[in-house]
């Protein structure tokens, strides 16, 4: 996105439409202006995503950290995922939106480098957190008697993820620059002391190599691995359902398994769908930016970027809709009440990885053996 502006300004004559009292850049054709109604709608949409992303992920993090009973491998990874989403909602969303509309950077050199860096780090952390969750689910369901990750493994995995994310995102810090070069040949006073922020790699081949690597590392590679894991989980759960048909209360377990299956894939599918438009947009622009009409670029980018940023709201939405325990805790959170252990209120579904559980985020379906243990202890807690 940032490099697009440079080529756009470089190849078009610029004029300032003072009659509209707008700081937005206008090019040869007034059609390049986004209508005020569109800008207002986009601003409302971005504002809603920021509010929901910040409040939802913050509530999710606080609730899980407040409840010691919820500190298991999956929830630790969910907190990590929510933290990266929270970071993007605060550090990237507002700046990218304003920059795309204004077509010049007003937030200084530090934010110029931090904005793409944080976003790149976040998507790497998010996708590999989902990978670790898939690995944990796979081990607990496919190979319950084999190696199973514990909380210590989760913390080690998170550390490795952040190191990998920071390392893979460093080129943005190195090659992202703040410059007035596109405006140097513009004589209008309106563009004096205006700067743009974009990545300037040593060559196009370097940039293409890096962006292609990110495409594989951050999207296609991890998602393929995740879907393979969950496909194997689905097959195993389907076979288990057939066995449960012969067991008492199989109807209850079947409905719980169905809900858990939805939870297993919901966040992953939402992540893949949300990021797909921006991934396609960036790939097309990197390889042949002339395909995208100049006047359509900003609007198209904002729509794709907004769709991707909706992924920052996915965690609290799915967590809340599919987890009654989270809904109860959320009521306590907004009522400023203490987070106390409520054994009688919680669903009797094993959550801890010590119970050979089967699930994705806050809900886990216990094995038949675990169900027997649960029935013997009504105070077992999610």
From Swiss-Prot:
Extracellular compartment ranges equal 1-33, 97-115, 175-210, 281-298
- Any transmembrane segments, and where? 34-54, 76-96, 116-136, 154-174, 211-231, 260-280, 299-319
Subcellular location(s): the record lists: Cell membrane
For the Cytoplasmic compartment, the record's topological domain ranges are 55-75, 137-153, 232-259, 320-382
The gene that this protein is the product of is Npy1r
Protein name as it appears in the record? Neuropeptide Y receptor type 1
- Tell me the organism: Mus musculus (Mouse)
One GO BP: glucose metabolic process
Could you tell me which PANTHER family the record lists for this protein?
NEUROPEPTIDE Y RECEPTOR (PTHR24235), NEUROPEPTIDE Y RECEPTOR TYPE 1 (PTHR24235:SF24)
- State the Pfam families in the record: 7tm_1
Phosphoserine modification sites are: 367, 375
């Amino acid at each position: 996105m940032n490099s697009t502006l440079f080529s756009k300004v470089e190849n078009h004559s610029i004029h300032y439409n003072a009659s509209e009292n707008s700081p937005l850049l206008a090019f040869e054709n007034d059609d390049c202006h986004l209508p005020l109604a569109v800008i207002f709608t986009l601003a409302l949409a971005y504002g809603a995503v920021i509010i929901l992303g910040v409040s939802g992920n913050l509530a999710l993090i606080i609730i899980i950290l407040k409840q010691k009973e919820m500190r298991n491998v999956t929830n630790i990874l969910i907190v990590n995922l929510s933290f990266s989403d929270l970071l993007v909602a605060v550090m990237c969303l507002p700046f990218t939106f304003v920059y795309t509309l204004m077509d010049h950077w007003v937030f200084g050199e530090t934010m110029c480098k931090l904005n793409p860096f944080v976003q790149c780090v976040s998507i790497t952390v998010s996708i590999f957190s989902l990978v670790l969750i898939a690995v944990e689910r796979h081990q607990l369901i496919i190979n319950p008697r084999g190696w199973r990750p514990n909380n210590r493994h989760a913390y080690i995995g998170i550390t490795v993820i952040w190191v990998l994310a920071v390392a893979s995102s460093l080129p943005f810090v190195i090659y992202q620059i703040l410059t007035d070069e596109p405006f140097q040949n513009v004589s209008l006073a309106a563009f004096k002391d205006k700067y743009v922020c974009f990545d300037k790699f040593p060559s196009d081949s370097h940039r293409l190599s890096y962006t292609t690597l990110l495409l594989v590392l951050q999207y296609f590679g991890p998602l393929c691995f995740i879907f393979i894991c969950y496909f194997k989980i689905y097959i195993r759960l389907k076979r288990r359902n057939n066995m449960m048909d012969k067991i008492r209360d199989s109807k209850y377990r079947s409905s719980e398994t169905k809900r858990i299956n939805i939870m297993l894939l919901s966040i992953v599918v939402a992540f893949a769908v949300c990021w797909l438009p921006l991934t396609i947009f960036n790939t097309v622009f990197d390889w042949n930016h002339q395909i995208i009409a100049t006047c359509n670029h900003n609007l198209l980018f904002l729509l794709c970027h907004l769709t991707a940023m909706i992924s920052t709201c996915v965690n609290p939405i799915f967590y809340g809709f599919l987890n009654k325990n989270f809904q109860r805790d959320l009521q306590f959170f907004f009522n400023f009440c203490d987070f106390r252990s409520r054994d009688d209120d919680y669903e009797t579904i094993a959550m801890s990885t010590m119970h050979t559980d089967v699930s994705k985020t806050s809900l886990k379906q216990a094995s038949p053996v675990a169900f027997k243990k649960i029935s013997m202890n009504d105070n077992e807690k999610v």
